[in-house]
Swiss-Prot record:
Induction: By arsenite and antimonite. Keywords: Arsenical resistance, DNA-binding, Plasmid, Repressor, Transcription, Transcription regulation. The gene is arsD. This is Putative arsenical resistance operon repressor ArsD. Pfam families: ArsD (PF06953). The keyword Secreted does not apply. Disruption phenotype: Deletion of the arsADRC operon results in increased sensitivity to arsenite and antimonite but not arsenate. InterPro entries: Arsenical-R_ArsD (IPR010712). GO terms for biological process: negative regulation of DNA-templated transcription; response to arsenic-containing substance.
Amino acid sequence: MTQLTLYEEAMCCSTGVCGPDPDDELVEVSAALDQLENEFDVDVSRANMQHNIEQFLETQQIADLVEEHGPSILPITVVNDEIVARETYLSYDELASTFEDSPDPQEA
C-alpha cells in the first residue's frame, strides 16, 4: 500500500475545511485526497502543526526542513517516505501521477 502524508501549517481543524468560509484550495485538496483513497491503494494521513506536532518531530527530514525554512516550506507532500512537493498543494492529477510512477513498497 502506498503511504501519502501531507504536512501542513497550523489550522483550526485537521483539514482546514471548517467554519463558514473555508479556503477553496483546502476544499479541493480534501476532495482530491478522498478521490485518491477511493481509486488507489493509498493510505492518506494529514499532519498539521497545531494538532499533530509530534508527527513533525518524529520525522527528522520534515523537522529539519521546517527548522531551516520555517513554516513557509509547508505544505510538504510525502509519498512512501519521499518528498514529492513542498510549498504548494498538488492537484488530484499531480498526486495520481506520483502513484502511477511510484512502485508499491510491497512490490519493490
